[in-house]
């Protein structure tokens, strides 16, 4: 098969979106109410990693980067995730705290995008979550100098075994280079697939202490 033939096959991959629409009259005043409903439905549908979200950041050269992390908490203050503070994303957030999040719930023909500003969590918040993680995950946080180059996986595995022995007694301490971010809720867009590509999109935009809701063309 030539490259052109393969491209033609990819170009014809499509499906119809038939799971239902989203109407203005059905929208709650608070976007978190709708987000919670959709997240609950994603969990009930047994989607793989329903809390997985794409975090988009920009570096000092205006180059965008994306990666998938897990949502660990949300409320009216924002959406929370945790990471190595020496990671690429953490450095980029330090340089430019404006980020976007995307929840891609393909099976439900839905996606949610959040735009806001990321800020560091307090040490108390981070410590509380860190010690709720499985012990091996706590040790794993110590192992990796995230985004650095390594020659082989064996380096990580050896370090893990070394630290597992070191921390076999008592609590695993919180690494100073591990933390979390809360992304404020400035804009939240809900997308529901529709027939004939007439998708439903609604944008919640914060204005003072209220939310303005607009329908967007697909």
Curated annotation (Swiss-Prot):
Biological process per Gene Ontology, one example term: pyridoxine biosynthetic process
Residue numbers binding substrate: 14-17, 72, 129, 133, 137, 197-199
Biochemical pathway: Cofactor metabolism; pyridoxal 5'-phosphate salvage; pyridoxal 5'-phosphate from pyridoxamine 5'-phosphate: step 1/1; Cofactor metabolism; pyridoxal 5'-phosphate salvage; pyridoxal 5'-phosphate from pyridoxine 5'-phosphate: step 1/1
GO molecular function: FMN binding; pyridoxamine phosphate oxidase activity
InterPro entries recorded: Pyridox_Oxase, Pyridox_Oxase_CS, Pyridox_Oxase_N, Pyridoxamine_oxidase_dimer_C, Split_barrel_FMN-bd
Its biological purpose: Catalyzes the oxidation of either pyridoxine 5'-phosphate (PNP) or pyridoxamine 5'-phosphate (PMP) into pyridoxal 5'-phosphate (PLP).
Name the record gives this protein: Pyridoxine/pyridoxamine 5'-phosphate oxidase
Name of the gene this protein is made from: pdxH
């Amino acid at each position: 098969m030539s490259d052109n033939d393969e491209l033609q096959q990819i170009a014809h991959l499509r499906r119809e979106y038939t799971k239902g629409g989203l109407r203005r009259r059905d929208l709650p005043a608070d976007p978190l109410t709708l987000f919670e409903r959709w997240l609950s439905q994603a969990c009930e549908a047994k989607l793989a990693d329903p809390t997985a979200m794409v975090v988009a950041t920009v570096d000092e050269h205006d180059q965008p980067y994306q990666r998938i992390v897990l949502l660990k908490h949300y409320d009216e203050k924002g959406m929370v995730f945790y990471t190595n503070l020496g990671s690429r994303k953490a450095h980029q957030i330090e340089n430019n705290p404006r980020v976007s999040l995307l929840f891609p719930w393909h099976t439900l023909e839905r996606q949610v995008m959040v735009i806001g500003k990321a800020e560091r969590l307090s040490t108390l918040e981070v410590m509380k979550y860190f010690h709720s993680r499985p012990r091996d995950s706590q040790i794993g946080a110590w192992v990796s100098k995230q985004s650095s180059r390594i020659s082989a996986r064996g380096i990580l595995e050896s370090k893990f075994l070394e630290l597992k022995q070191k921390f076999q007694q008592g609590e695993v301490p919180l690494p100073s280079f591990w933390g979390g971010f809360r992304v404020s809720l400035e804009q939240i867009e809900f997308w529901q697939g529709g027939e004939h590509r007439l998708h439903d999109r609604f944008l919640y935009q914060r204005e003072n202490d209220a939310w303005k809701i607009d329908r967007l063309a697909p």
